[in-house]
Swiss-Prot record:
Similarity comment text for this entry: Belongs to the WD repeat gemin-5 family.
Low complexity composition bias: residue spans: 598-646
InterPro entries associated with the record: Beta-prop_GEMI5_1st, Gemin-5, TPR_GEMI5, WD40/YVTN_repeat-like_dom_sf, WD40_repeat_CS, WD40_repeat_dom_sf, WD40_rpt
Function: The SMN complex catalyzes the assembly of small nuclear ribonucleoproteins (snRNPs), the building blocks of the spliceosome, and thereby plays an important role in the splicing of cellular pre-mRNAs. Most spliceosomal snRNPs contain a common set of Sm proteins SNRPB, SNRPD1, SNRPD2, SNRPD3, SNRPE, SNRPF and SNRPG that assemble in a heptameric protein ring on the Sm site of the small nuclear RNA to form the core snRNP (Sm core).
GO MF: mRNA 3'-UTR binding
Biased composition (Basic and acidic residues): 772-793
UniProt-recorded name of the protein: Component of gems protein 5
Biological processes, Gene Ontology terms: spliceosomal snRNP assembly
Entry text on domains: The WD repeat domain mediates binding to U1 snRNA and to U4 snRNA. The WD repeat domain also mediates binding to the 7-methylguanosine cap that is found both on mRNA and snRNA molecules. The regions that bind snRNA molecules and the isolated 7-methylguanosine cap overlap at least partially. Besides, the WD repeat domain mediates interaction with the 60S large ribosomal subunit.
Organism listed in the record: Dictyostelium discoideum
Sites marked Interaction with U4 snRNA and with the 7-methylguanosine cap of RNA molecules: Y583, R910
Residue ranges with Acidic residues bias: 794-809
Length: 1276
């Protein structure tokens, strides 16, 4: 068989039938979703990635440049093995990516297709991506370039590319989709590129369809290799020796050897009893050269025959827990295959104790069984597979009976994919020679221990435990712990400044130290014990000294609260909890000495601080001279707190969920929560509070609490929840409130809201200090006067309330001053509830009528395009604030200069949390919906705001051309840009972004001119129709049609008189391009002869029939009713009837129309659409046949109602249906059966009474026993 010639012939046939060149391909471009064509540029320093997708047969792949890709959610992550860095992502699919693969390198081809990869998804599309790893120089000693080092190209592609659309293929930092097709009708399960044909891609789906994709011409061919039930394709494997063969694995256990060039089945193997999960097609040349399988005594008598060199060997594995080796039986593939050996991985599956949660594997549970295979030509003697637990096994193909060698244990759960990394030099010959020598040595020393096994390749595995492990010499060298859920919360602590605690949606807390271990920056510790739900909020106990910094309080999605002890790796869960998820959880700071109020100079401040320190401890004396440096000042404050609280233990926790604040006692885990809402109202009876609380935060000293609400208000309380003041600036829900960490800015508060704003407030205390001091001195030790002071205070409060009765509702609006106007004072209510404070402060609290608050808005930061989910103050610079938003970006603001100084882009989805690093003042981390945590350097970002330098557009990916069926109008509409996952907040304000149908409704009430303009816009936006004529299409745009002009002019200007003189007649002109002589030609469409037009229509209709475009085939033949009857016959013959064709068949006459309806109803019955089949039968008056359809399909209810609506009540068919329905339900529903018999009791021919009595005596249920006697009496 000449394989190459067959491919060439097939390709020529395709081109002959479709006359499509590259120019035509560009005319059929479909706009891809916006996220596919965006060239994003990410500059993250490190990335904690999302884990791979589970239970997919081709979830990962690696190329010769050691670029590793794997599918995660709807994206593909790219990892450079040489530099040990994640270098980008491919974003564009709208559903889970199920399969990925690389194009193969062809040394003889001068192209860059080996830099392309292919992906298949549950969104029914196959996409081809171009990316660049900056390894074109193949220098292994150099790191990745700066542009690609920090994830350039992630998010679909790179923002640095696309400056020149014509040169985008040469952009080294761009990842984007260049081709795609939508030919699959079900989710794609497997994609694979041919190792022998550079532009050939095959893909299979859940419906059993195989799609051949030729990227050079951008053509696709959908093929169903087999027809039947349970024919979902699970895996594909190209032949390494035959360019026209592919092995197809199905969920029903069948392996099919298929010739996709001639579209025929070569051989069918009943390989397994369950899903085929992996197929390895061994390279026959390498197998023969290295004597693989030779020493197992499996060869036939004709082994010496030269044809044996072409024998095919396969390996398959399945959910039936078997790995089988197959060998071709005869000299031809059509002879079939025989199973020469079966490996049993369950025999070597040892249960592992899980260190990452989730328990072990039940080997008897087929839903949990997964096997995968890997074979490399560079180590041909060994076949790699996983066990049924978590091991990687090495099977010796020379000695089948030897036990497999195991990789050192590192995974804890099922392994989904094993990938062997090819040599970077791509030199197969050299590697093969080395392997051959090793193989011969192995044959001589078969009895030696298997520990001498040496693989020439590195190996990468992905597992259910969310780990990606890179192996060398059977040992785990690099471990990458992926995230399996949304990242909801991140926190860090000064006692472990290089570690971030991450609350994740996969029921775990991760401890990640990206700056601690440069060799393994992706290793993280997983805390999972006792966590049984998503961790939506967490807080490290950072204010109670080093001994308590190992405590992490966390709130979960199910409303429960717990504390995790890192040292003991155990968690404790409080009883009870919120009804819904917890938004925020915090530790109550320890009580700290409160400094004297209203201090005007630094000398007084130092004196008072010294006095306070003398009362508690003397460790603060050395800290008052270091106030110039912000970083030192922050560390001093932390040290002061730590030194003064060494003996204190954490006490209280506060959580917000279900719009309530709960207090938890850390010292009593058996105690349930305390609902603070009624307590707050009891402490502040004269205030009205919103019912829906969303966030809570303590200030630096712990003496003030801020609480946010869903209506946009913020309430400020004392540490004992005594109301101080209220802020009303936001118009929507408050997501986060955060006090500044620095002493000099301790009264500055930031808030984030769903109104897309970040607002900075400053609270200032004002009042007459000298008078207050005098009052304190005069009232010391005078208890009676204190009581009088209380009475006077209450009187003053009443007077103030009467005077300001009309101002209380809008007090914040009156005091907020954005334009340096006169500040308004707020009086603090005086309620003494704190019995632990000293006498001096108690007196002050009772006599602080002159202490008032001034609240001013420092700035409103407006720039985010969606909800602001989180804010975080810098730990080094008191003026820097980071914010995370649902627009997918992280923003850094400067409250001093009131500017946006950096915008970090790269997340694919909403960003839920942001946290600053304590080690590097320029670093901060963020996490969100894309299940990743990214470490950013805000000082190196190219953008300052969200709107700056809008993301550049890459060239639109080309949509493939279907050569097997028509692209219907509905499919063309589906090819229009899809809505991205993230909503665009500017659409409501930008009419150009509103869909055309919305513009119609908006402008329908406008004048006629506006309406006409809108209709024009809608018409222009409709999908372009493909011409019905295939051979004669685009006649207007032909560039080489000038040769037809002169003959056409002579044709139309020649009359009978002229023909006598010139001896030219119109008959001498040939029509079309198939002239047999050298006469001048004109196109057939300009002919005046009907027979030529009829030939043209006939020729075009045959072309439509060849590609199964039956809709246009019938439409074309309906132009001439004489041809319609024969056209309908052809459609019926091919079984391609549709509803549209049936409706058009009326033109052929009533008799033919009725026959077509009857045939179409039978077709509908075969596919299970009984109701529509009945409708077509009723259309032609066949009521009895319609009832019979329901009767045969046991749809008695429909049949009876249809019969009663069309026939008389005493029609015999009705009683017959009731009787059959009664017999059908005698066992399952005897009561209903009795009712059906009673409905036919008067029909003597049916013996219903006898059948009913027999039923009553045979079926004895409680219900029948109750009515049996009554029924028997009535019937007698």
């Amino acid at each position: 068989m000449n394989i190459d010639s067959n491919i060439i012939k097939n390709e020529n046939l395709i081109n002959a039938n479709n006359h499509t060149d590259r120019r035509d391909v560009h005319d059929s471009l479909a706009e891809a979703p916006e996220k596919i064509t965006e060239l994003k540029k990410n500059h993250w320093e490190e990335l904690l990635p999302s884990s791979s997708n589970w239970y997919c047969t081709s979830v990962a792949d690696c190329n010769e440049n050691q670029i590793y890709i794997y599918a995660c959610k709807s994206n593909v992550s790219i990892f450079n093995i040489k530099s040990k860095k994640f270098i980008g992502e491919l974003n564009g699919h709208t559903d889970r990516v199920t399969s990925v693969g690389f194009f193969k390198r062809f040394e003889s081809k001068n192209d860059e297709s080996y830099k392309w990869c292919i992906t298949g998804s549950d969104d029914k599309t196959v996409r081809i991506w171009k990316f660049n790893s900056n390894d074109d120089d193949h220098n292994e000693d150099t790191e990745i370039g700066d542009d690609f080092k920090h994830g350039s190209g992630g998010g679909g592609s790179d923002g640095g590319g696309g400056d020149d659309v014509n040169n985008f293929y040469g952009n080294k930092s761009s990842n984007f989709c260049i081709y795609y097709h939508q030919e699959h009708k079900a989710g794609v399960t497997c994609v694979v590129a041919s190792p022998l044909v550079p532009d050939l891609v095959l893909s299979g789906d859940k419906a059993g369809a195989l799609v051949i994709y030729r990227t050079l011409t951008n053509h696709v061919f959908p093929i169903p290799p087999i027809i039947g039930n349970n024919i979902s394709i699970s895996t594909l494997a190209f032949s390494p020796n035959h360019s026209d063969l592919v092995a197809i694995g199905y969920l029903n256990g069948i392996v099919l050897i298929y010739n996709f060039v001639i579209r025929s089945t070569v051989c069918k193997i009943s390989a397994h009893s369950a899903d085929v999960l992996s197929i390895v097609w061994f390279d026959s040349t390498i197998i023969q050269k290295n004597n693989i399988f030779h020493d197992n005594n499996i060869n036939d008598q004709d082994d010496n025959n030269s044809n044996h060199r072409n024998r095919i060997f396969l390996a398959t594995c399945s959910k039936d827990k078997a790995i089988k080796i197959w060998k071709q039986v005869g000299e031809k593939i059509e002879s079939g295959f025989t199973n020469i050996y079966q490996f049993n991985p369950s025999k070597y599956s040892i249960q592992h104790s899980s260190s990452s949660g989730g328990g072990g594997i039940n080997q008897n549970d087929k839903q949990r069984v997964w096997l995968t295979l890997s074979w490399s030509p560079e180590s041909p003697q060994y076949l790699l597979s996983n066990s049924l637990t978590a091991d990687v096994l090495i099977w010796d193909l020379i000695n089948f009976k030897s036990p497999p060698e195991k990789f050192q244990s590192s995974h804890q759960r099922l392994i989904f994919n094993i990938t062997q990394i090819p040599n970077s030099d791509g030199s197969l010959a050299k590697t093969t020679a080395t392997t051959e020598t090793t193989t011969k040595n192995k044959i001589k020393n078969k009895d030696k221990k298997q520990s001498q096994i040496k693989l020439n390749n590195k190996v990468i595995t992905v597992s259910l435990d969310r780990q990606i492990i890179i192996w060398e010499n059977l040992k785990a060298k690099i471990k990458i712990q992926g995230l399996g859920g949304f990242v909801y919360s991140i926190d860090t602590c000064s006692y472990s400044p290089n570690t971030f605690a991450i609350g994740c949606g996969d029921n775990t807390i991760r401890l990640w130290s990206p700056t601690e271990n440069s060799k393994d920056a992706y290793e993280s510790k997983t805390l999972w014990k006792g966590i049984q739900s998503k961790v939506t909020s967490l807080s490290i106990c950072k204010d109670y000294g080093f001994s308590n910094s190992n405590l992490i309080a966390f709130g979960m999605d199910d409303g429960r609260v717990g504390v995790y002890n890192i040292n003991t790796n155990q968690s404790k869960i409080f009883p009870g909890g919120h009804k819904n998820e917890i938004y925020e959880i915090i530790w109550k700071p320890p009580p700290t000495p409160t400094p004297q109020k209203n201090i005007n100079n630094n000398n007084n401040n130092n004196n008072n601080n010294n006095n306070n320190n003398n009362n508690n401890n003397n460790n603060n004396n050395n800290n008052n001279n270091n106030n110039n440096n912000n970083n030192n000042n922050n560390n001093i404050n932390n040290n002061n707190n730590n030194n003064s609280n060494n003996e204190q233990q954490p006490n209280k926790l506060y959580s917000i969920g279900n719009n309530e604040i709960y207090e938890w006692d850390y010292n009593d885990f058996n105690k349930s929560f305390t609902n603070m809402t009624p307590i707050i109202q009891q402490l502040n009876p004269k205030e009205t509070f919103s019912k829906h609380k969303t966030d809570i935060n303590f200030n630096l000293n712990g003496d003030m609490i801020s609480i946010g609400y869903s209506d946009g208000t913020i309430d400020i309380f004392t540490s004992e929840f005594l109301f101080l003041t209220r802020i009303r600036e936001h118009k929507k829900l408050i997501n986060r409130v955060q006090w500044n960490h620095f002493k000099e800015n301790e009264m500055i508060l930031a808030s984030a809201s769903t109104d897309k704003k970040v607002i900075i407030y400053k609270l200032s205390k004002i009042g007459n200090q000298n008078e207050n001091e005098k009052k304190i001195d005069n009232e010391k030790g005078k208890e009676n006067e204190n009581e009088k002071g209380k009475e006077n205070e209450n009187e003053n409060e009443n007077e103030n309330e009467n005077e300001n009765e009309n101002e209380n509702e809008n007090e914040i609006e009156n005091i907020v001053n954005n334009n340096n106007e006169n500040d308004t004072e707020i009086e603090i209510k005086n309620i003494n509830k704190n019995e632990n404070v000293d006498k001096e402060e108690m007196v002050e609290n009772n006599n602080n009528n002159n202490i008032k608050y001034k609240i001013e808005i420092l700035h409103q930061f407006i720039g985010h395009k969606n909800n602001v989910c989180s804010v975080s103050w810098s730990n080094v610079d008191p003026n820097l604030l980071g914010s995370a938003s649902a627009d997918g970006t992280v923003q850094v603001w400067n409250i001093k200069s009131k500017e946006a100084i950096s915008n970090m882009r790269g997340h694919d989805g909403r960003v839920f949390t942001v946290c600053w690093s304590l080690l590097d003042p320029n670093l901060l981390v963020s996490g969100g919906e894309d299940q990743t945590v990214r470490l950013w350097n805000y000082s190196t970002q190219p953008f300052k705001t969200v709107t700056e330098s809008q993301i550049k557009k890459s060239p639109q990916p080309e949509l493939s051309i279907s050569l097997n069926k028509k692209i219907t109008e509905q499919q063309q509409q589906q090819q229009q840009p899809q809505s991205p996952i993230k909503s665009n907040p500017d659409q409501s304000n930008n009419p150009s972004l509103v869909p055309p149908i919305l513009l119609t409704s908006v402008t329908s009430t406008s004048n006629t001119t506006a309406t006409a303009t809108t209709i024009t816009q809608i018409t222009e936006s409709l999908p372009k129709k493909r011409p019905i004529f295939l051979l004669n299409k685009d006649i207007v745009q032909r560039q080489d049609s000038s040769q037809y002009v002169v003959p056409l002019a002579k044709y139309f200007t020649t009359n009978d008189q002229d023909s006598i003189n010139t001896n030219e007649t119109k008959q001498e002109y040939e029509f079309g391009s198939n002239s047999e002589n050298n006469n001048s030609k004109i196109e057939a469409i300009f002919s005046e002869k009907k027979e030529i037009i009829n030939k043209l229509v006939q020729k075009e209709s045959l072309e439509l029939l060849k590609i199964d475009d039956v809709e246009n085939y019938i439409s074309l033949n309906s132009w001439n009713p004489a041809n319609l009857k024969q056209a309908l016959y052809q459609v019926i013959k091919n079984g391609k009837l549709t509803g549209n064709i049936v409706s058009l068949s009326i033109q052929a006459g009533r008799e033919i129309f009725e026959s077509i309806c009857n045939l179409y109803s039978q077709q509908l019955i075969c596919i299970g659409d009984y109701h529509l089949a009945v409708s077509y039968l009723l259309m032609i008056g066949k009521v009895n046949e319609a009832i019979e359809v329901y009767r045969n399909t046991l749809l008695f209810q429909e049949a009876i109602i249809l019969a009663k609506s069309r026939f008389l009540p005493d029609d015999p068919i009705i009683n017959k249906l009731f009787t059959e329905w009664a017999k059908q339900t005698e066992t399952s529903h005897p009561i209903h059966s009795i009712k059906c018999y009673l409905a036919t009791i008067n029909d003597q021919s049916l013996n219903s009474k006898q059948e009913l009595l027999k039923l009553l005596s045979s079926v004895q249920t409680k219900q029948i026993i109750k009515i049996q006697s009554d029924l028997e009496q009535i019937l007698k």
